[in-house]
Structures are given as C-alpha cells and as structure tokens.
Amino acid sequence: MEDFVRQCFNPMIVELAEKAMKEYGEDPKIETNKFAAICTHLEVCFMYSDFHFIDERGESIIVESGDPNALLKHRFEIIEGRDRTMAWTVVNSICNTTGVEKPKFLPDLYDYKENRFIEIGVTRREVHIYYLEKANKIKSEKTHIHIFSFTGEEMATKADYTLDEESRARIKTRLFTIRQEMASRGLWDSFVSPREAKRQLKKDLKSQEPCAGLPTKVSHRTSPALKTLEPMWMDSNRTAALRASFLKCQKK
C-alpha cells in the first residue's frame, strides 16, 4: 500500500500526510491504510476547490486556464492542510469578516459564495452512515456536510451539492480510479475491511526484521487528519502545482 500511495498521489500531498501521521506517533510505513485515506481526503479537498472562482460581480465561475488580468477570488478557502494554529486563525478571520458562526471543530473548506463552512468526507462505507456520524459529531446546522464514496455515491446537507455536476464527476472519477488501482494490486479488500487490514498488518510486522527506531506497537489514537500541517499555499496559485496529477494515478 505504501508504494501505491507514493505512486498514485502528488508528492506534496504525500509529504503533508506523512507529517500529519508522524506528529501523532503514527508511522506511514506501518499504518498504510490510514496513510492512503489521509492522502485521498486531502486530494478531494483540493479538487473541490480547484478551478472555482468568484468574479468582480460576485458570481461563481469556473476557470481552468487562469487569466492573470482577471479580478478573480478563490470561491473556496482551503482550511484542511494548514497547521492547527494557522487553520484556527483563518477560521476566526472568516468569522469576524462574514459574521458566520464559529464552528466547534475545524472544517475543511469555506465557501465564500454560500457563506458557509464545509466538512468533506470520503468513505469506504455507506454514505448515509458516514454522513450521520459526521452530523452527530459536528452538531451544527451551520456547517455544510458533503460525503463522497469510492463507488460514486454522494450525500450532502439538504441535498445541496454545492458544485456543478461536472466538478463532482471529476472527484467521483478520481475516487473510482483509486479504487480500481487498489483492486488491481490486491489492496482494496484490506483497505475496506479493518479486520483484514489488522490481519495483514500482523503478517507484515512478522515478516520485517527488527529495526532501530521503528515502533513495535501500532498506535490506535485517532489523529485529526491533516489538521496540524504547515500551510503550503497562501496565494492565488496555491493549487497550480497539484493539478497535473489530480485526474489519474501514474501508470503501474
């Protein structure tokens, strides 16, 4: 799985995910399913934001090849992927500027057009189950929830999917591609089933020679995925370096 992640995802995303896991005492080389899940979630957040702008009239537009002279503002503020302090600073700034209610938990995005925070979910299970879990945790009608699955299903608050159909289709296609690539390598079943993943993990650990500095016990703490990472982009070109590798995995 680790090799797959490094082949399939942009190196910047891999670096962010590695830093998040190591900060919480988790090893990407051991907890490879979590490694893959964090990379996937971060990539979906980028894709959700990518190409969406607000013009000088306040209208939402899609621009795939940017005009440097255009007065455009990113429609979405990416909160996911920043270190925790910076993320809360951004959230507080948005709340002070717009008057929206401050969320109890760090959301993933802010939508300047709809004036609401967004929580993005990517699940290997039934979308409605994961949606209810998210809603129960957040306990706020102000934060919009949008869940995607690897099977092409999605669920959003009040069936409001925020993005146009084509933009959502890009995300669904990417997730389906990840699933197919995992399946072709025999990785999908263990990625979906925690029980199978634990069995595979024990098998992998037994096959490894003892290594200095390598944790011998897997951490089961839940890390707030990517919430404590350093900000990697702060201007209008923040997603440009990632776009080329978003749509498909590298060939095996």
Swiss-Prot record:
State the source organism's domain of life.
Answer: Viruses
**Which GO terms are recorded in the biological process aspect for this UniProt protein?**
viral RNA genome replication; viral translational frameshifting
Localization per record: Host cytoplasm; Host nucleus
Q: Does the keyword Nucleotide-binding apply?
A: no
Task: Give the annotated active site.
Answer: E80, D108
Q: Which UniProt keywords apply?
A: Decay of host mRNAs by virus, Eukaryotic host gene expression shutoff by virus, Host cytoplasm, Host gene expression shutoff by virus, Host mRNA suppression by virus, Host nucleus, Host-virus interaction
Q: Sorted alphabetically, which InterPro entries does this protein's record hold? A: PA/PA-X, PA/PA-X_sf
Task: Pinpoint the site Important for efficient shutoff activity.
Answer: K202, K203, K206
Q: Where is this site: Important for efficient shutoff activity and nuclear localization?
A: R195, K198, R199
GO MF terms held by the record: RNA binding
- Anything noted about its domains? The probable endonuclease active site in the N-terminus and the basic amino acid cluster in the C-terminus are important for the shutoff activity. The C-terminus acts as a nuclear localization signal. The C-terminus is recruited to host protein complexes involved in nuclear Pol II RNA processing.
Biological role stated in the UniProt entry: Plays a major role in the shutoff of the host protein expression by cleaving mRNAs probably via an endonuclease activity. This host shutoff allows the virus to escape from the host antiviral response. Hijacks host RNA splicing machinery to selectively target host RNAs containing introns for destruction. This may explain the preferential degradation of RNAs that have undergone co- or post-transcriptional processing.
Name the family the entry cites: Belongs to the influenza viruses PA-X family.
Protein name as it appears in the record? Protein PA-X
Gene that this sequence comes from: PA
